[in-house]
């Protein structure tokens, strides 16, 4: 039997570096440093080295941080292309309007479904 691993990314919100997030644990709520595109890339590479993967971005990627909003998402396009995503859905990406959304999608190396 062939195994296919699904890799999912969502709600990046333009955060390229690890950042504090409030996380609920058994002991209550606490802040932890999460995320970071370099860390995500490493995890994706490790999974791909083990076998076939389908990598999906579920959106909320190109909007949120200063760099994302100031560039209307464009600054993140080459970074996201480097992650070798297979396909994406969108959510806040529509905040840049139809033309902005189309421009982002045109720059990606993968389809926006």
Residue ranges and their predicted role:
Residues 1-113:
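Acidic, metal/ion-coordinating pockets
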């Amino acid at each position: 039997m062939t195994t296919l691993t699904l890799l999912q990314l969502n709600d990046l919100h333009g955060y390229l570096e690890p950042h504090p997030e409030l996380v609920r644990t058994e002991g209550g709520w606490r802040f932890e440093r999460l995320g970071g595109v370099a860390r995500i890339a490493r995890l994706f590479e490790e999974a791909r080295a083990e076998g076939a993967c389908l990598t999906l971005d579920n959106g909320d990627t190109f909007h949120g941080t200063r760099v994302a909003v100031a560039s209307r998402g464009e600054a993140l396009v080459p970074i996201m292309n480097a992650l070798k995503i297979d396909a994406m859905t969108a959510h806040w990406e529509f905040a840049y309007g139809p033309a902005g959304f189309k421009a982002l999608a045109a720059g990606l190396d993968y389809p926006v479904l």
